[in-house]
Every structure is written in structure tokens, then in C-alpha cells.
């Protein structure tokens, strides 16, 4: 296989991988074998992008890699390629590669990175969106992309030695990555959205099963991310109870960590063995302790708090200037030495850059490295209608028997709705938050990470409608069926902030949806908001559609007097017809020959 890679694709066919990852493997082969041909081949594959017959953004082949400065296209392919670029940059010292991967990283962390550490905003191509395009309900954030993001930041740390890369890695690890697997290890998320109305549930397997196998491979590799060694420097990058045997200057060193991190900020690092004499222990001081949500202005803390930290060696406080985010202790260590680190850990509120439209007027809540969310099992009200106080105060509640042991956050909030006269109402409630990674373990229902603090961002519970009170059935029975009558409509054809239903992967077929009313009703119009994810997705507006009603004999009949069955994107397509008294109506659609169809909402009046 490696012989083919290093000969066939150089001498006979100038081609590059359609799905990047070979570059990382080749760099690793170079490190293991010392054979230059593997590193040369990794660089060759990267160098050829932008010069082959395939020049699309989807596969990051739109321009030479050293000219790229924005994360685009399929997020998993991109992350694997960026990790390969970081490998080549570090192993060759090529400044063009170093500058390119630094530019791309700046773009991700500054404009395309979710508060949960996820990347890849849209299901349309499983891709990065535009700058600051970070929707919540439709956030894709593929589990594999989160793993790829860890790969990228780990390699950039190895290249530059700066703690900011581990700040990003840690956020991804504790939130948008481990959310991809259930607490018992038996269910998996492909996408990891930041908001839900109940259309998401972990699955035991997928037809395209990259995520389950990927995360099952990644988790056992985690011990390798805790420490790093360079010459006589030992980097302590992650905080978890462990015993590790290291080589420092070729000599054996054994360290033991004891901690309940991330639930509290106390970490003890003990020296069990040291044959290396004097070395520098570099302890990462996380960005969240230093009042930095992420190493950019994409997110900032909004509560005005200032956290602090302390470091003691054998009970005595020590001081040190931070260097690249690390607290450095240089000494001749001996067996039995103990370093006690304390990080203040309080609930914090976060706001997004105002350019992130989906998060304007909203706050997120985190404590330490953990991002929290509101979920339905802990709250006896619609969590999507929550309205946060201006300066919320949080109580931390330990729940050792809930979801394998978590901390909940509780605070006072309000629920917004409308009374019978259409006036806005606010009801005081006690809101409970749980760690984002632990959501969707107690059944399907509503969840939200970003919580409104401005009326313009709120979503008051809407009055019930005939459609919302109806029983929904469809020819394709999936979780997203709940989107059909959730009373949420898109503001335009590109709005992915509301959920949708589709018939994918069926193509060219006749499909249907039906409403069974609570009681007999007279209806005379239907409005449909079509879903179309061109150009990369597989859904297009239908060829045609019709409305049927159920007659007294229980048979479906087409409505009469229909004026127009519209198929416009981004707006409601209303058909008016002769009034009919019935217990049920049906929407029948004919899909395009080579595509599926879908819809955001179906209203009846």
C-alpha cells in the first residue's frame, strides 16, 4: 500500500486523496521509520491541491494549500488536511506551510468555532459555513469534525508550544466531542446541534459509520494528550487523575495527578520518580481562568467576574510569569514532591461576537471547561421559551447519581408566552442547566445552549394552532417529523435556525404527510414552507403537490377549487380551496426525479 502511495501517485497519476487523512498517516510513518519518502509524499499530496482537475472548495482543492486562509468545504476533510499541513509544517520547517496553517486556524477560532468546540455549521455539504455563520438548531458539528479539530490543535501545539491550542482542544474535548457518544458507550451522534425540539437522538449505528468507529478509536488515545515533553520541559496540558511514565532528557520520570476536574479546580501533581534531575514543569493555566473564553474575540465573558489561580510546591506558594499560557516551575525535583494547583471555578455567562446573528441577544453558561444547556427533563416548561435575567446568579448542585455524576446549575429565569388576547406574558421559574455533553440521555425533547437575554432573541410559546394540536403521520417516519407542526417558520430560504423534515434518501417518489385533527374542523387553506439545500445537499422543491381531505366514509379526496400550488423557496406557499369540514387532511408531494424534497412547516386554516 505504501509503495503504491509513494510511486503510483507521483510517477503515473498526479492525483490527491478525495478524503484527506493519508497525509497524517504518511507523516506518522516518517516519524516511525525515518524514511524521507513518506514525508515527501505527504507534502506532495498537499502541494498538488489547487492544480489537479478537481478544484472545488468542498474538498479544499480550490487553491494551493499555502495560499489558503479560510476554512471551507467539508469540515472533516478540512480538519484532516489542516492536521496534515501542521505535520508537514512542523517536520519540514516550511514557512509557507506554517503561515498558511496559522491563518486557517485564526479563521476557525475567530469566525467559525462553536462555543461547544464544534466545527462545521451546515449539513449542506457537512461543511463550514460563511464567516460568523453559526446556527444552533441546524448546527452540524459532526463528531468526526470535533476529533479532527483535536488533531489540528494538538499538532499546532507541538509546532508552536503555546497553551492556546490546548484551550481550544480542551473545549472541544469536554463538550462537542464527547457529546457524540452516549454515557454507556452504546449510542452515537453524527451531528451535535446546540438546540433541539426533540428531533435528535443518539443511534446505535449509521449507514455511514465513520463517527462511531472514530470516537471509539479516539477515546483510548486520550492518555497521550495529557503530557508533552520537549528536551527538559514537561508540559502538563490536561487535568485528570492518572499515573504517567515519561522520558525527560532520556531519563525516567513518573508523575501522578489527583483531581476531580472538571467538577472542581483542585489538581495535585505528585512526583513518584525522577531520574532526570532538574527540569521545568510547565502547567497550562486554562484560558477560562484567565478570562478568555477562546483565543479570539468570537466569544467573551459578559458577567464582569475575574477568576484567579494559585500554585504551591510542597505546601509553599510559588510565583512565576506565564509563558505562552504556562506556569513554569524549574527545579531539581525529587520523589515525593507535590504541586498543588487551584483554579477558581464559578459559573460564567458568555456572549458571542455581535456578527454571529444566531447568538445576538443571547448568553451561554459555562463552568470551568464545561458548557451547560437547558433540557426538558429538568424543567417542567418549554426551555426554548426561557428568558434569562440580566445578571443571573447560579447555584451549583452536585448530582452524583444523575447521568453518571454531574453538577447542575440552577438560576431564576422567566418563561415567555402569550395570553388569550395575544399579549406577551412572563412567568417566573427556576431554571436547571446540565452539562451539554450529557443531553439527550433521557428521551427526546427540547434543549438549548444559547439562552435569550433580549426580547429580540426570545421565542415565546406560541398559541396553539389547528396544525400544532393535530396528530402527524408521514410516509417517512423519522424523529424530525416533529418539525412539521412546531410553529417555527424560516425567515428566508437560507435560514437553518429552524428544524425541518425531509424524505431523503428517497428520490422521484410520491410521498405524503397527514394531520388528524383533535375534532372535526372546517379548513380552506394550506401553507407550506419548502426545504431546499442546494447546491450540495440532496433536497429540492417538489415537482408538484396537492391537498386531500378525508370524507365521511374515511376516504381521501382531493380538495376542490384550489387556486395555486406554489413551489417558491424562502416563503410560505399558500393554496386556498373550497371550505371543507373534515377530521383529517393530507399533503401529497411528487419528488424530483433525482432528488428528495422536504419542508420546514405545514400550516392549515
Name what the model sees in each region.
Residues 1-8:
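Short, small-residue-biased leader/transition segments that mark boundaries at the very start
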Residues 16, 460-462, 494-564, 569-605:
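Aromatic, loop-rich ligand-recognition surfaces of beta-strand-rich domains
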Residues 17-32, 57-80, 118-142, 185-209:
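Carbohydrate-binding/catalytic loop surfaces
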Residues 21-34, 80-95, 107, 133-137, ...:
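Well-ordered alpha-helical scaffold segments within catalytic/enzyme domains
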Residues 32, 37-62, 103-118, 197, ...:
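Core domains of carbohydrate- and sulfate-ester-processing enzymes
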Residues 42, 101, 167-175, 180-272, ...:
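C-terminal beta-rich recognition modules with glycine/proline-rich loops and embedded aromatic residues
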Residues 92, 99-142, 146-201:
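Non-catalytic carbohydrate-binding regions of carbohydrate-active enzymes
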Residues 281, 309-311, 545-547:
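Short beta-strand elements bearing conserved aromatic residues within extracellular beta-rich modules
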Amino acid at each position: 500500500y505504501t509503495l503504491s502511495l509513494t510511486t503510483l501517485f507521483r510517477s503515473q497519476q498526479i492525483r490527491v486523496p478525495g478524503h484527506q487523512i493519508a497525509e497524517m498517516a504518511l507523516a506518522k510513518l516518517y516519524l516511525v521509520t525515518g524514511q524521507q519518502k513518506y514525508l515527501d509524499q505527504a507534502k506532495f499530496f498537499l502541494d498538488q491541491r489547487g492544480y489537479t482537475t478537481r478544484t472545488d472548495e468542498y474538498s479544499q482543492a480550490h487553491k494551493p494549500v499555502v495560499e489558503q486562509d479560510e476554512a471551507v468545504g467539508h469540515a472533516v476533510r478540512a480538519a484532516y488536511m489542516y492536521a496534515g499541513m501542521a505535520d508537514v509544517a512542523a517536520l519540514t520547517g516550511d514557512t509557507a506551510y506554517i503561515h498558511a496553517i496559522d491563518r486557517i486556524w485564526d479563521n476557525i477560532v475567530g469566525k467559525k468555532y462553536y462555543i461547544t468546540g464544534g466545527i462545521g455549521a451546515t449539513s449542506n455539504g457537512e461543511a463550514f459555513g460563511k464567516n460568523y455563520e453559526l446556527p444552533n438548531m441546524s448546527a452540524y458539528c459532526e463528531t468526526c469534525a470535533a476529533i479532527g479539530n483535536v488533531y489540528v490543535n494538538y499538532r499546532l501545539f507541538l509546532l508552536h508550544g503555546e497553551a492556546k491550542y490546548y484551550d481550544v482542544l480542551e473545549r472541544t474535548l469536554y463538550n462537542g466531542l464527547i457529546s457524540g457518544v452516549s454515557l454507556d458507550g452504546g449510542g452515537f451522534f453524527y451531528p451535535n446541534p446546540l438546540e433541539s425540539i426533540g428531533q435528535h437522538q443518539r443511534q446505535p449505528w449509521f449507514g455511514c459509520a465513520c463517527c462511531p468507529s472514530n470516537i471509539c478509536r479516539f477515546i483510548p488515545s486520550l492518555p497521550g494528550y495529557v503530557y508533552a515533553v520537549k528536551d527538559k520541559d514537561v508540559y502538563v496540558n490536561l487535568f485528570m487523575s492518572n499515573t504517567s511514565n515519561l522520558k525527560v532528557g532520556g531519563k525516567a520520570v513518573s508523575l501522578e495527578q489527583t483531581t476531580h476536574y472538571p467538577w472542581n479546580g483542585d489538581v495535585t501533581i505528585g512526583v513518584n520518580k525522577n531520574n532526570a534531575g532538574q527540569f521545568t514543569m510547565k502547567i497550562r493555566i486554562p484560558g477560562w481562568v484567565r478570562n478568555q473564553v477562546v483565543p479570539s474575540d468570537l466569544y467573551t465573558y459578559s458577567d464582569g467576574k475575574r477568576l484567579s489561580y494559585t500554585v504551591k510546591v510542597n505546601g509553599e506558594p510559588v510565583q512565576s510569569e506565564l509563558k505562552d499560557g504556562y506556569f513554569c516551575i524549574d527545579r531539581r525535583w525529587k520523589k515525593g514532591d507535590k504541586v498543588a494547583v487551584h483554579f477558581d471555578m464559578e459559573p460564567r455567562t458568555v456572549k458571542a461576537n455581535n456578527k454571529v446573528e444566531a447568538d445576538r441577544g443571547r448568553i451561554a453558561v459555562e463552568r470551568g471547561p464545561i458548557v451547560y444547556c437547558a433540557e426538558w427533563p429538568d424543567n417542567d416548561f418549554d426551555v426554548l421559551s426561557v428568558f434569562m435575567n440580566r445578571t443571573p446568579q447560579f447555584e451549583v448542585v452536585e448530582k452524583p447519581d444523575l447521568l453518571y455524576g454531574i453538577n447542575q446549575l440552577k438560576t431564576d429565569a422567566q418563561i415567555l408566552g402569550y395570553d388569550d388576547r395575544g399579549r406577551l406574558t412572563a412567568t417566573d421559574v427556576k431554571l436547571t442547566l446540565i452539562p451539554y455533553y450529557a443531553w439527550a440521555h433521557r428521551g427526546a425533547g427540547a434543549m438549548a445552549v444559547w439562552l435569550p437575554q433580549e426580547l429580540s432573541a426570545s421565542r415565546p410559546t406560541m398559541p396553539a394552532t389547528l396544525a400544532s394540536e393535530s396528530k402527524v403521520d408521514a410516509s417517512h417516519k423519522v424523529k424530525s417529523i416533529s418539525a412539521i407542526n412546531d410553529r417555527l417558520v424560516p425567515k428566508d430560504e437560507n435560514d437553518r435556525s429552524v428544524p425541518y423534515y425531509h424524505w431523503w434518501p428517497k428520490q422521484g417518489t410520491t410521498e405524503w404527510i397527514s394531520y388528524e385533527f383533535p375534532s372535526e374542523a372546517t379548513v380552506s387553506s394550506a401553507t407550506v414552507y419548502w426545504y431546499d439545500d442546494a447546491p450540495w445537499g440532496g433536497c429540492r422543491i417538489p415537482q408538484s403537490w396537492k391537498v386531500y381531505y378525508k370524507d365521511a366514509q374515511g376516504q381521501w379526496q382531493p380538495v376542490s377549487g384550489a387556486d395555486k400550488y406554489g413551489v417558491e423557496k424562502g416563503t410560505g406557499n399558500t393554496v386556498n380551496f373550497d371550505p371543507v369540514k373534515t377530521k383529517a387532511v393530507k399533503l401529497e408531494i411528487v419528488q424530483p426525479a433525482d432528488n428528495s424534497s422536504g419542508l420546514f412547516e405545514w400550516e392549515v386554516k
